[in-house]
Amino acid sequence: MIHDLMLRWVVTGLFVLTAAECGLAIIAKRRPWTLIVNHGLHFAMAVAMAVMAWPWGARVPTTGPAVFFLLAAVWFGATAVVAVRGTATRGLYGYHGLMMLATAWMYAAMNPRLLPVRSCTEYATEPDGSMPAMDMTAMNMPPNSGSPIWFSAVNWIGTVGFAVAAVFWACRFVMERRQEATQSRLPGSIGQAMMAAGMAMLFFAMLFPV
């Protein structure tokens, strides 16, 4: 969860715009079923990340979404291996697989039974199967909160990695505008940039209270 109201709305806006782009791509014209699945998974991810930025997002179940996005990561990974050609395209699908995996990670981090990174005393204060919405310690875990080094390392990798990805996609969008290029198979470069920026902010919120 993000505590700063302005930043919370920024993150929400990024993911809502991305979800709108994916939704329009599904209904705008007929596409192969595999592309509909791709856009649908990105739509679901954008909605889930927008919800996660808000306090009431902690009240939603976490096990189901974690498993769902883990399977989504498997889908993109399998597609990259068996269904697409070209190194660049495979790399793109692999990137989206990692993004789905990162979403699954965030949901797992919210559930101490899926990802036990906190102390036993913290677990004892939580109700069965969920995390209290007002506290949401797992989503705002600063370095001094007792989380292991590997947990913080993963979140740092997510923060830096998606920040770099956001810059990459933003630059690519500018280049495409100059060349009048378009994207049709997956969210366009501006959508990719917004998703990556939102993910970087949420990963940062898992490292420091913002």
From Swiss-Prot:
One cellular component (GO) term of this entry: plasma membrane
Biological source species: Mycobacterium tuberculosis (strain ATCC 25618 / H37Rv)
Matching Pfam families: DUF5134
Name of the protein described by the UniProt record: Uncharacterized protein Rv0970
Residues annotated as transmembrane: 9-29, 35-55, 64-84, 91-111, 149-169, 190-210
Keywords: Cell membrane, Membrane, Transmembrane, Transmembrane helix
Subcellular compartments: Cell membrane
Induction: Highly up-regulated during the early stages of invasion of the human blood-brain barrier.
Signal peptide: none
Membrane topology category: Multi-pass membrane protein
